[in-house]
Amino acid sequence: MAKEKIRIRLKAYDHRILDQSAEKIVDTAKRSGAKVSGPIPLPTEKSVYTVLRAVHKYKDSREQFEMRTHKRLIDILEPTPKTVDALMRLDLPSGVDIEIKL
């Protein structure tokens, strides 16, 4: 495959699981003979939700919750068919969202 690259975007709420998954992908790609760029940390998305503490009144008493979405980007340059096959067989945790673009 000439002049091709595979771009992998990983998303997760837990950054430790995300980094472990990224290392697995990089290690698998390097073992199969492809050049790897990354993992590149992308900006963390932070969603803040404000909820009233009381059920009926007391609007001044509120509670805030936040959800952080961590993201990583991995580019696999010059992938071989062996690389693609190895990535398809890779077993990653269920808490990691993977987006692959060829």
Curated annotation (Swiss-Prot):
GO CC field = ribonucleoprotein complex; ribosome
| Keyword tags | Ribonucleoprotein, Ribosomal protein
KW Nucleus (keyword) present:
no
Q: Enumerate the GO terms in the molecular function aspect.
A: structural constituent of ribosome; tRNA binding
Q: Entry's Pfam families?
A: Ribosomal_S10
| Subunit record text | Part of the 30S ribosomal subunit.
Role summary: Involved in the binding of tRNA to the ribosomes.
Output this protein's name: Small ribosomal subunit protein uS10
Q: Which gene encodes it?
A: rpsJ
